[in-house]
């Protein structure tokens, strides 16, 4: 299966909706799309909606951690929302939830970043 990447801009927030599998085959495409969008659109914050993400491996974790650092170094925040139980376990095991905020849905994530 492949990965579908949907980007939406709301003020200074980049909202990324992922559908499918985030693995070593698709991680580079996600990295480049998010990095390009952050740089071109003056994005401060990043929301990842993982509701329809069915699989993620360590390559996906690496991309997410790298984008967290990119946003954080620019004074912004990253929020992950609508995560499935399987992906949530991966986040917990990797320790990503210690540094990346989790919200139950997009509306909550946008509200926490001041966009409603």
UniProtKB/Swiss-Prot annotation:
Description of post-translational modifications: Phosphorylated by SpoIIAB on a serine residue.
Residues recorded as bearing Phosphoserine in the entry: 58
Keyword Phosphoprotein: yes
Residue ranges annotated for the STAS domain, each copy included: 3-113
GO biological process: sporulation resulting in formation of a cellular spore
Keyword Iron-sulfur: no
GO molecular function: anti-sigma factor antagonist activity; antisigma factor binding
InterPro entries: Anti-sigma_ant, Anti-sigma_F_ant, STAS_dom, STAS_dom_sf
Alphabetized UniProt keyword annotations: Phosphoprotein, Sporulation
A Pfam family it matches: STAS
NCBIfam families according to UniProt: ant_ant_sig, spore_II_AA
Family per record: Belongs to the anti-sigma-factor antagonist family.
Primary role: In the phosphorylated form it could act as an anti-anti-sigma factor that counteracts SpoIIAB and thus releases sigma f from inhibition.
Name of this protein: Anti-sigma F factor antagonist
Encoding gene per record: spoIIAA
